[in-house]
Amino acid sequence: MATKDTGGGQQKATRSTEEVEEQAQDAQASEDLAERQEKLSDDVDSVLDEIDDVLEENAEDFVRSFVQKGGQ
């Protein structure tokens, strides 16, 4: 009786060079995005601190500048 090989042998989990390069690019992109996000967070914090300083110095004038005049 003949036996049939179903190909159920062990498969090696190997990655092609392209997959490795793609993962390296993804990792670099993630690092770049993290750096951009950190810089933007710092910029936003800086702007908010500046607004707080202006409000602490002269809140009344700041609010008056945004009040609509003459129904406009």
UniProtKB/Swiss-Prot annotation:
Residues 33-42 have a biased composition (Basic and acidic residues). Residues 1-45 are annotated as: Disordered. Residues 1-10 have a biased composition (Gly residues). InterPro entries: Ubiquitin-like_Pup (IPR008515). The modification Deamidated glutamine is found at residue 72. The keyword Coiled coil applies. Pathway: Protein degradation; proteasomal Pup-dependent pathway. It comes from the Bacteria. Residues 28-66 are annotated as: ARC ATPase binding. The keyword Coiled coil applies. GO terms for biological process: modification-dependent protein catabolic process; proteasomal protein catabolic process; protein pupylation. One of its GO terms (molecular function) is protein tag activity. Pfam families: Pup. Keywords: Coiled coil, Isopeptide bond, Ubl conjugation pathway. Residues 10-60 form a coiled coil. There is a cross-link at residue 72 (Isoglutamyl lysine isopeptide (Gln-Lys) (interchain with K-? in acceptor proteins)). The N-terminal unstructured half of Pup provides a signal required to initiate unfolding and degradation by the proteasome but is not needed for pupylation, while the C-terminal helical half of Pup interacts with ARC to target proteins to the proteasome. Strongly interacts with the proteasome-associated ATPase ARC through a hydrophobic interface; the interacting region of Pup lies in its C-terminal half. There is one Pup binding site per ARC hexamer ring. Belongs to the prokaryotic ubiquitin-like protein family. Protein modifier that is covalently attached to lysine residues of substrate proteins, thereby targeting them for proteasomal degradation. The tagging system is termed pupylation. This is Prokaryotic ubiquitin-like protein Pup. It comes from Streptomyces griseus subsp. griseus (strain JCM 4626 / CBS 651.72 / NBRC 13350 / KCC S-0626 / ISP 5235).
